[in-house]
Amino acid sequence: MAYYFGAVVSELNPAVLPLDWLLGTWQSDEPGEGSFPSITPFRYTETLHFSHVGQPVINFMFNAFHAESKKPLHRECGFIRIQPGTNRVAFIVAQNSGLVEIEEGELTGQQLTLHSTAVARTSFAKQPYVQQISRHIQLKPDGRLEQTVSMALEGQSLTQHLHITYRRTD
């Protein structure tokens, strides 16, 4: 039995059973590192929530805060789907910055490697515009979750932007 916002829901849908290692709440175990050629490097903390309601998708919500000032940074929410009968995975993401993306890739054991196949933004999004995103999430042998995000902006090639590790808190 699983819980979602206090309500009891059905068992995990078999379609997303290969992603059960993500379920729960994860908190950064130390501040992550953010950098990009066009910004001042920064440190951040982040909480990840992965849940389900018995459908063939995993729901997620990511909340990041500046490590020193504690000001809110990026917020991401969305869904993870698996193409039935394959290891093909899709991340469908909406960010508080007005960016929406679809990332697709592969699930290999307990790691996800994803690359954007579509990136859209609000008409008044901040420039330079994000053109491409890649994400690597893996469960380490010590039980920590690690995430690395790279991005490309207009006129800049794909470059690592974020790196952080988490510990499960529930």
Predicted segments with their positions:
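Hydrophobic/aromatic beta-strand elements that line small-molecule binding cavities or substrate pockets
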Residues: 45-51, 76-81, 102-106, 132-139, ...
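Helix-adjacent hinge/juxtasegments
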Residues: 67-106
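Short conserved catalytic/interaction loops centered on acidic-Pro-aromatic/His motifs
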Residues: 124-128, 148, 157-159
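Acidic, glycine-rich flexible loop segments
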Residues: 98-99, 107, 113-134
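Short, surface-exposed beta-strand-loop junctions and turns on beta-sheet-rich folds
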Residues: 66-67, 97-99, 120-121, 153-154
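Short hydrophobic/aromatic-rich beta-strand segments that constitute the beta-sheet cores
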Residues: 28, 58-62, 88-93, 112-116, ...
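Amphipathic/hydrophobic helical signal segments and adjacent flexible N-terminal regions
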Residues: 1-57, 61, 65-72, 142, ...
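Short, solvent-exposed coil/turn segments at beta-strand boundaries
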Residues: 53-56, 85, 107-110, 140-144
